[in-house]
Regions:
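Compositional signal for N-terminal targeting/processing segments
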Residues: 1-186
Length: 186
């Protein structure tokens, strides 16, 4: 099973748990001492603020400056770490564009950024393996191609994720099916 990371990563807890999962059965001995210590720290980390404020910035820096050390440990799992870290960086940008409010503002810059990120991430993943079958579950805002009612309010996201995938400029070459937020492509 390949974990396809099209959506942005909006939870530090989820990112920490995912990193621990990726490191679960890895052999750290091939990496240099600094990388080993970082990965052991992540693996044993119990405090969210330590992960967020210390270990995660080190991991991002390591990915940017010496990714080969991480690849020695992760091997084929490296792509999943890359996607998760990209998703986290996209979440930080989205939060900044949304003025750090908890809910995305419909019609705002953050909503448009998130739709762009979803589309670009899936496009990148699809280019890596265009013959695969993809399945995903997305919120109504990402998949409704017409107005929809939520909490008594009518919402509409211009150029939403699924509208782009179904449009004439789409990178997809198969059948796209959307039923109540479930997206499949064959």
């Amino acid at each position: 099973i390949s974990i396809v990371g099209a959506d942005i990563t909006d939870s530090i807890e989820m990112l920490c748990t995912f990193c621990k999962y990726l490191l679960k059965d890895c052999d750290f001995s091939a990496a240099d001492r600094e990388t080993q210590m970082l990965l052991i720290g992540i693996q044993k980390c119990r405090l969210q603020y330590r992960f967020q404020n210390s270990l995660l910035p080190q991991l991002i820096e390591q990915m940017q400056t010496r990714p080969e050390q991480l690849e020695l440990v992760l091997g084929d799992k490296m792509i999943h770490l890359e996607r998760a870290l990209l998703g986290w960086q996209q979440e930080l940008t989205c939060n900044e564009l949304n003025d750090y409010q908890p809910e995305l503002q419909h019609g705002g810059k953050a909503m448009a950024y998130r739709e762009d990120a979803l589309y670009a991430n899936l496009q990148r993943i699809y280019q890596e393996n265009p013959t695969a079958k993809y399945f995903g579950s997305f919120g109504a805002a990402h998949v409704q191609m017409t107005r929809y009612v939520g909490d008594g309010t009518v919402y509409w996201i211009d150029d939403c994720f699924v509208s782009r995938m179904a449009g004439g400029e789409s990178f997809l070459d198969g059948t796209l099916t959307v039923i109540h937020g479930i997206v499949t492509h064959e």
